[in-house]
Regions:
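Short alpha-helical segments used as structural interaction elements across diverse proteins
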Residues: 46, 260, 429-430
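Domain-terminus/edge residues, biased toward the C-terminal soluble/receptor-binding domains
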Residues: 136-137, 150-153, 157-158, 163-413
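Single-pass type I membrane protein transmembrane segment
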Residues: 412-420
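Polar low-complexity intrinsically disordered regions
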Residues: 30, 54-57, 338, 391-395, ...
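Intrinsically disordered, low-complexity sequence elements enriched in Ser/Thr/Gly/Pro
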Residues: 36, 332-335, 435-437
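C-terminal membrane-anchoring or membrane-association module
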Residues: 422-440
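Active-site-adjacent loops and short helices of periplasmic peptidoglycan-processing enzymes
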Residues: 1-157, 161-175
Length: 440
């Protein structure tokens, strides 16, 4: 039974779970659909290996052949989870990564870390650097495998950031979504089959929408589970930490994924339609920008708004931010962003785009047909080589005016258009879609 949020704002609370911490995010947008103690720190156990694999993919070469060192074989507990590598064994980085993500091979993480990071200490530095780049503020990693260390911790939110970054790497998703991997023979062992330990991909608790994930368990960490799932075009990532048992962590994850799939709806801006994505600006009527098949200023069609089913979108708050630091290029130039929030929750965003499809007319033609009280002609043509303007030696002034053009484009071209059209228009379009959906 779904309950309303304790704040009374109508946002659904979601199911009760036994894990002490959890979060579900939309994998494509990063929007948070459910959370429980998502900033509380826990030990991640083997869910650490998501970061290990991501760092190896970004910094290593899958075809490299590594040799398992004495340290990799012996400095990791022989009774912990392993893929079966021994000292002197030679495997490719790719084979080791399958062993890490499927069999949770601790010795494989050490071997990969030594190879990719030049030393295990160097690799751990790469792990912490990557976590920081992703915005993980409550995490620190002391090893590559996740076996207990007091200085090795994270939280559900940070782990979701790591999992989402990994989701954006196609090779990672290929590995984590593999149920069985045929490991070829090596110089030490015969060929064998590696089996994914995630029960949603294999075993009696198979979940039909699961596309990957990682398990984790130690005495101190309890039971942790990260799951990737896809249903009806929605891609979700669930993170559950510090659950009492394996059965509990899988039951929690299934509940959360089913809840979010069934009670949230998403709308992509490109579902609205091309004409409704554009809005007027003074550039549409400028003779300096002739024959524009696309609008000069528009919103990106790739943005997505995600809300609970039946939610009143008109209650959302709209925030517009502009970016004047860009360098104009042909094609789409991101010049701002619209963010939709509900309370403290971000429910969607989309980019404001300046479309630079072609060079303007010549300065001479522009002067003849464009009123002088509009944008100054020298500002419009500030990106043109000064020598072509007949004013050699004024390159610095031209560059200054080029920057001014960008600021004018923002202030004149989209200042009113964005506020009037997008802020009200997109809300109205989504509201109309919701009404149609409810009538069905």
């Amino acid at each position: 039974m779904l309950k309303a949020d304790e704040t009374g704002d109508g946002w659904p609370k979601g199911p009760e779970i036994k894990g002490d911490g959890a979060v579900v995010v939309d994998a494509d947008t990063g929007n948070i659909l459910f959370e429980k103690n998502m900033y509380e720190q826990f030990y991640p156990a083997s869910t650490t290996k998501i970061l290990t694999t991501l760092v190896a993919l970004e910094n290593g070469n899958l075809d490299d052949v590594l040799t398992v060192s004495y340290a990799a074989d012996n400095y990791v507990s022989k009774t912990s989870s392993r893929m079966g590598l021994t000292e002197g064994e030679q495997v490719t980085v790719e084979q080791a990564l399958y062993g890490i993500m499927l069999e949770s091979g601790n010795e494989a993480t050490y071997a990969v870390g030594e190879h990719v990071g030049k030393s295990i200490a160097g690799f751990i530095k790469l792990m912490n650097r990557k976590a920081k780049e992703l915005g993980c503020e409550r995490s620190h990693f002391a090893n590559s495998h996740g076996l207990h260390d007091e200085d090795h911790y994270t939280c559900c939110y940070d782990l979701s950031l790591i999992a989402r970054a990994a989701y954006q790497n196609p090779e990672f998703m290929k590995i984590t979504g593999t149920a069985f991997y045929n490991m070829p023979a090596t110089n030490k062992h015969e060929a064998k089959i590696l089996t994914n330990h995630h029960w949603f991909l294999n075993g009696t608790q198979k979940y039909e929408y699961a596309t990957g994930g990682k398990t984790g368990a130690t005495t101190q960490a309890g039971y942790a589970l990260v799951t990737y799932a896809r249903k009806d075009g929605k891609n979700l990532i669930s993170v559950v930490m510090h659950a009492p048992t394996w059965d509990d962590v899988y039951a929690d994850s299934r509940k959360l994924l089913d809840y979010c799939f069934d009670h949230f709806v998403s709308y992509r801006m490109d579902e609205i339609g091309r004409d409704e994505l554009r809005f007027p600006s003074c550039f549409d009527y400028s003779p300096a920008f002739p024959d524009q098949e696309d609008p000069i200023v528009k919103i990106s069609g790739s943005g997505t708004i995600i809300i609970p089913d039946g939610f009143d979108i008109s209650k959302a708050k709209k925030t517009i931010t502009y970016d004047t630091s860009f360098e104009l290029e042909h094609g789409d130039n991101r010049i701002g962003k619209i963010t939709y929030t509900y309370g403290s929750r971000t429910i969607g965003d989309t980019d404001i785009v300046l479309y630079n499809a072609a060079y303007p007319l010549t300065k001479k033609v522009y002067e003849e047909c464009w009123p002088s009280y509009m944008i100054p002609v020298d500002v419009v043509f500030a990106d043109v080589d000064p020598e072509l303007l007949g004013k050699p030696g004024e390159k610095e002034e031209s560059l200054r005016k080029s920057r001014l053009l960008k600021e004018n484009a923002l202030a004149i071209g989209i200042g009113a258009g964005v506020s009037v059209f997008i802020v009200g228009g997109v809300i109205a379009l989504i509201a109309r879609k919701l009404r149609k959906r409810r009538r069905r």
